[in-house]
Amino acid sequence: MAALQALVIYTIILFFPKPEQASVPTVDLSIFQNLQQVVYHVAQSGLIIQEERDHVRPSWEAWIHITSKRRAVLALYLLHWSYSVAKCVPSFNCRELGFMPAPAAKMLWQVSRKDEWEPLYDRWLIRWEGNEYLQQEFWEIEPGVMIDRRTQKWLEEADEFGILLMSLGNYVSLHHLQLGSSSGIVLTIHQ
C-alpha cells in the first residue's frame, strides 16, 4: 500500500511543473504504460474484499486498506487524465474499474476510531441494502437537471474526492455524447 501511495506522489511530481516551469513537461509515453501495468497488477491483487461481496462489515483495518488502495488507483487514473488534458493525449479507459464501489462515504472515511466506525458502517450497510453504488454508475448518469435516486443518495454521503470523480465522469460522459462516440470513454479537449 505504501508503495502505491508513493507512486501517486511521484506521479504528481513527475507530471506537474515546478513553479519556475511555464508548462507541464512532456513525459515519455512508456511511463504511462508502466503506470497502467502497475494498476493492473494492483487490480489483480484485489480491489474488493470478500466481506464487501457478502455485504457484511469487514474489519476496520481491512476496510481502511482496501479503500485506500482503491483511492490510490483512482488517483493514478485522475492524474493521468489531467496530464492527458494538458497534453492532448488519450487517457486511460477507466471502465475496467466499473466493478469497484464508488469512493466511500465521507462519514466512514473520516472516522478515526474503530469503535466509532463499526456502528456507522453497520448503518451504512442497512441504508444501501447490500447494493452499494459502483464506479460504473457514474457513466450511467443521464444529462439534465435531475439525477437518479441512487446517485443522489451516494452524493449525500460523498466526500470531496468522490465529488471530483463524479464531476469528471459526468463531464467526460457529456463530451462523449456530444462527440457521438459509441466506444469507450474518449476525451477530446478543445483548447
Region locations from a protein language model:
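C-terminal transcriptional activation/regulatory domains of eukaryotic transcription factors
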Residues: 1-20
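C-terminal effector modules of eukaryotic transcription factors
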Residues: 22-191
